[in-house]
A protein has these predicted regions:
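Polybasic, low-complexity intrinsically disordered tails and interdomain linkers
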Residues: 1-37, 95-113
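Short basic, glycine-rich beta-strand/loop surfaces that mediate nucleic-acid
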Residues: 53-54, 58-112
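A short linear-motif detector with a strong N-terminal bias
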Residues: 1-2, 20-21, 47, 66-71
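Residue-level signature of catalytic and energy-coupling elements of molecular machines
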Residues: 25, 41, 60
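Short charge-dense sequence patches
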Residues: 3-11, 50-59
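Extracellular/luminal Protease-associated
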Residues: 33, 38-52, 57, 65-69
Length: 113
């Protein structure tokens, strides 16, 4: 994923953290995806072992939830308001970030083609 797009993903997480609702951690994110209670999922690429998140892309695709990867769990944790790294974040309510989410979803879909 291009750096410019990664920055937009972090920005969306920050906006949702401040004006909407985000949930953090792979277990919490998995539950929300299974229930269809999230609009966007972000996963860190530097998670060890990678099997921790291996199921999430499939679940997201089954439920038609947009997802993206970012390189750093530390930066993802920071963007979501934590002082610790986090493997995954679910945006439950984007708050004022709706236009950014729509733009990101379009760009991510283009990348997958």
């Amino acid at each position: 994923m291009p750096k410019e797009l990664q920055d937009k993903v972090y920005e969306l997480v920050e906006i949702a953290r401040d004006t909407g609702k985000v949930k953090k951690g792979s277990n919490e994110v998995t539950k929300l995806v299974e229930r269809g209670e999230t609009v966007f999922v972000v996963m860190a690429e530097d998670v060890q072992p990678p099997e921790i998140l291996a199921h999430l892309p499939l679940l997201c695709e089954e439920r038609n939830i947009t997802y993206a990867y970012v390189p750093s769990k530390a930066e993802l944790g920071n963007a979501s308001g934590l002082e610790k790294p986090t493997a995954a974040v679910a945006v439950v309510d984007v708050g004022k970030g709706k236009p950014l989410l729509e733009n990101l979803s379009e760009q991510i879909k283009k990348l997958k083609k």
